[in-house]
Structures are given as C-alpha cells and as structure tokens.
A protein has these predicted regions:
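Flexible glycine/acidic-rich beta-alpha junction loops that bind and position SAM and/or redox cofactors
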Residues: 49, 97-99, 128-132, 154-159, ...
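Conserved, mostly hydrophobic/aromatic
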Residues: 47, 51, 71, 120, ...
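Canonical Radical SAM [4Fe-4S] cluster-binding loop centered on the CxxxCxxC motif
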Residues: 33-69, 379-396
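N-terminal pre-triad scaffold of radical SAM enzymes
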Residues: 27-53, 79, 120-121, 142, ...
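Cysteine-cluster motifs in flexible loop/terminal segments that predominantly coordinate metals
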Residues: 54, 337-400
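N-terminal [4Fe-4S]-dependent radical SAM core
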Residues: 1-40, 351-363, 393-398
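Conserved SAM/AdoMet-binding glycine-rich loop
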Residues: 77-228, 232
C-alpha cells in the first residue's frame, strides 16, 4: 500500500561470499529411508549458461564457486558424522565448477575402498570430457545423466542450450569408453517454436547415443548398454525469457508424446514422460500470480491434497475448482502474454532486468544464442551492478 513503507519492488538477497558459509550448517540423518538418502554438498551457487526456460538459472545468479579444498573437507566431514554411503556434489551445473575434476579425483582417492559413492546430479554435455568421465566413474557406479533438452540443433539454439551434436556424441563416447553402460537423457516437449521434426529428433538423439554405446561396448543384452529418455512438458516460468510464452495445449501434448513413442523403435531405449494434466496445472499456477489464490482454495475444498504425489493427483478436482471460480485452466496456460503488459510477478525481482529477459526472448525468436558470461564477456543481465556482486570463479572455465 502507498505510505506503508514497503518497497514497490522486492529484490532478492544474495550471499556475495559463498565460500564464507559452512557447506554443512546442520546435517540431520532421518530414521527411515528417504528419496534423497545421501549427503549433499553444494559446490557452487548460480548458473550463467542462460537456458531461456530455466527459472533457477536466472534467479540464482551470479555464479559463486566454493574453493576445492572446502568442498572436499565438507564432503569427508559430512560422511564421517552421518554414516552415509553416498555423497552428491550438488548445484545447478556441478560439472561447470572450474575444479570439478580435481574435486572428484581427490574424493575418489580419499574414499577408495570405503564403499562410498560420489555422484553428480547431472552432467553438462559440453563439459564432460575424458578426464571427467574417468573421475565420475572412479567410485561405485550408477547411471549417467545428460540433458540435451531438445531434439534438434535449431531448437537448442532457440532455448540457448549451447550444446552441439558433436558435444552430445563426444560426451556419450567418453562415458561408454570410461565403462558406463546406462545413460539417461532429459528433454522437454512443447518448447517455443517446437515442431514434429524436433519431437522425432528426440528419438534420433537417443538412438545415436545408443549406437555409440554399442560401437564401444558391443551389441546384445549382455553388454548392458541402454538409454532412457525422460521428457518433461514445458511450463512457462516467471522471471525467464520464456515467461511470455504459451503452454502447448493438453491434447497437442498428448499427440506429440504419442509421436515420440511411435518414433522410438529400439527395445534398449526406454521412454518416460510427464503427465500432461499435471503440467497443465503447473502452468496455471505459474502464470496466475495472486489471482490463483481463489483457484487454490477451491481446489483444496474439492479435496486436493499432496498433489505432487502421482497417486494423490486428481485432475478432475482441478477442473471442478476452475469451474467454481470461473477459470479455464487450459485458457490460462495456453494464453501468451504481451511483452508490454504488467505481469503478476513484476513486484518481485531476482535482479535480472526485465529488459534483458525481453532481449533474450527476441534472440530466441531469431534463433540467436547468448554466451556464458563466466567464459566470455558480460551479457548485461543486470545482476552484478544491482546487487553489487560478481561471478566468483576459483579456477579457469573453458566449457570443455
């Protein structure tokens, strides 16, 4: 309210010196098995890759790396006080840490023979070299996860993924030659400008990765080579260049999912995808802002509880709630927004300027990529001058 003393725009706070914080402020070990049943050590915060669909990549800027010695010490201290048999080096893009390979090498050496596994949530395709492949495989093995996100180079340029076909094939070869047998690939469906050709391209990328695995390891079920692809439905997220986008209609999402399944012919490629109805509700909640309060309350009255759990989600309840408050769920999700309109979340700011997001939206439409400012020049997102901070890189990043 005017005169209340509250700022018209609330800007995020930022930890400028990430290395001054304790990676393990409090580690609680549960009495039961949980989904993420492992020690987690955050090795860096922020990401400047600039994927245009990614909210975290925009809102957690700038990039701040922890020193290598601090990461190793925290991991070993955490394992000693918790008894976990796995430690995950977490961040938005762990392999982007300038000392990632050295950290893995040190942990693998120190933990040799202990039965402890060192894991990384996801690997960047263009920073997963031979050395990285060997170090990730140095401890107890699981599967490797990469995120090409789109099935064609054209669409990867639109979303600013900045990985090439060569990057994908080289990362796959490095992984298989280092002894890995299972690779998981993450994609998104319904991205702005996506066509059927891009959808079919998802299956083609998976097949190429599988073929490389068979070339390196051999064919047949005994080789153990397999590829799984997980396909999320694009949800427009606030404070991203794609916040003005429409979500693909529910029926069209289902049609494209079926097209992908029909395009995947190899039994060693497993396909899973997100529920179209869940993704529709996510888009509605993302785009409505404060106006979504009445919808959420109506959904609660209709019995919605723990809807992030698959066995609890009931789309009909959300449809009933929408009718009660006069909201068409698909109408909200599939409606594009104007670059000039005031958005429901404009009273909050991650310190990335709206002007930068608009420029990125226009560059996406033109298929023009934007470089990572930790490896090239400043892209003018506005975070550093607004918060009086800067990227803090411990070593040298070269993107490979």
């Amino acid at each position: 309210k005017p005169g209340s003393g509250a700022p018209q725009v609330v800007t995020k706070r930022c930890v400028a010196d990430f290395a001054a914080t304790d990676p393990l402020p409090q580690t609680i070990v549960p009495y039961m098995g949980i989904v993420q049943d492992r020690l987690a050590v955050e090795v860096l915060r922020g990401c400047a890759r600039g994927c245009r669909f990614c909210q975290a990549g925009m809102t957690y800027r700038p990039v701040r790396e922890r020193p290598r010695a601090q990461v190793v010490e925290a991991a070993e201290r955490g394992l000693a006080i918790t008894g976990y048999d796995e430690v995950s080096l977490t961040s938005l893009s762990t392999t982007d840490h300038s000392g990632c390979a050295a950290i893995l090498h040190q942990l693998n050496a120190d933990l040799a023979g202990s039965g402890v596994r060192v894991s990384i949530p996801s690997q960047r395709l263009d920073s997963f070299g031979v050395e990285m492949a060997a170090e990730v495989g140095g401890a107890r093995r699981g599967g490797l996860t990469f995120a090409p996100e789109a099935g064609s180079q054209r669409l990867r340029d639109v979303i600013n993924k900045n990985v090439s076909e060569e990057d994908i094939e080289l990362a796959a070869r490095n992984a298989f030659e280092a002894g890995w047998r299972r690779v998981k690939l993450y994609f998104m469906m319904g991205l702005p400008t996506e066509t059927d050709e891009d959808v079919v391209g998802i299956a083609s990328v998976a097949q190429r990765v599988l073929d490389i695995g068979r070339e390196v390891v051999g064919r047949g079920y005994k080789s153990g080579v397999s590829v799984s692809i997980s396909v999320a439905v694009f949800v427009p997220k606030t404070h991203t260049p794609f916040q003005w986008s429409a979500q693909l209609g529910r029926d069209e999402v289902i049609r494209r999912q079926r097209l992908l399944l029909a395009s995947t012919h190899d039994r060693d490629i497993k396909v899973s995808y997100h529920d179209a109805d869940v993704s529709l509700v996510e888009a509605v909640l993302s785009k409505m802002g404060r106006a979504g309060f009445d919808l959420v309350m109506a959904a609660w009255r209709h019995g919605c509880r723990f809807d992030a759990w698959t066995d609890q989600f009931d789309f009909q309840r959300w449809l009933d709630a929408g009718r009660e408050v006069g909201v068409s769920l698909e109408g909200v999700a599939s409606a594009p927004m104007s670059l000039d309109q005031r958005l429901p979340w404009d009273h909050t700011s991650p310190a990335v300027s709206k002007g930068f997001l608009k420029r990125e939206w226009r560059r996406a439409a033109a298929g023009v990529t934007t470089a990572d400012c930790t490896m090239e020049s400043c892209t003018g997102c506005g975070v550093c001058p607004t918060l009086a901070v800067s990227n803090r890189i411990e070593g040298v990043r070269d993107g490979k």
